[in-house]
Amino acid sequence: MQYDERYTPYIEMPGLLPFIQLVSRSTPNLNAAVVTALIDRWRPETHSFHLRTGEMTVTLEDVSMITALPIEGKPLCMSTDSEGWRQQMEALIGMSPQEPEVEDGGKKDRVPTGAPFTWIAANFAHCPEDADDEVIQSWGSAALAYLYRQLDDACRRTTKDGGVGGCMLLLSVWSWERLPVGRPKSSNWNTWDDHGNPVRRPTWAYKWDLVSEVASEVNLLYKQYTNEMDLLTPEQVEWQPYGAGPNFGDAHTFELNPLRLQEKHLWLMRCPLICNWAVEFHLPHRVMQQFGLFQPHLPEWVDTDTQLHRLRTG
């Protein structure tokens, strides 16, 4: 969908502008065979891929570097339990259209479901005087929580028509940066116009703006990728794709969005991630090598599968 510049001030306030800039462009196609091979190695108990080289996972570091979504802020949660759309509107915005009047004979007027534009214009034409300037929500942790939950569900499906949701761009770029399996060739990138605003500069995902397309049959590729993952060695893994030391986060070939490093102090948090009804734990201590740190021993085994996945916020 073509981006409309009139949205910019409203998208920039909650910290979503870098991500919207990214996804409003043409993003690389999903390599379904690689995703399926990764799902086979996902463990919902640890929220990590169990590979021959050890555990690996998508962390808040990857969320910042690839999407630049804000991590710090209010959790993205709301009640999802209601008796209908009117009750949901009242819970979210404090009001809803009135019920249709009852006609003679006990029947209600037939009206379309949802709030009509005339009602929206009458009630929201002007910003309330007591409205907050901005509310920053933790969209980054919500995106990771939902991706974790989708991987949790997908790895336990037994039907052939099962799928997976969440931010597949985040998962794809994470995989391409770290693993040689199914990695496409990055040829170049389209021109990026940041309009002179550093916040509109690209994220790390821009490295994969234009990639080679997968032409082989999916089932054959899946078998090939499965074999390649079974033979992975630590030397083949790019443990720190974003660099290390003073060169960390330097793409060398283009200027990156400054927001990607703004919340680096939060990347090693062991905390619950919340996305509405999904609550998932962030466990970076299990993959310390991804942060350039020494992993002295395997973390203690804690099975969160049953207890954690009973938690719901709605």
Show where each model-derived region lies.
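Structural stabilizers in ordered domains
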Residues: M1-G314
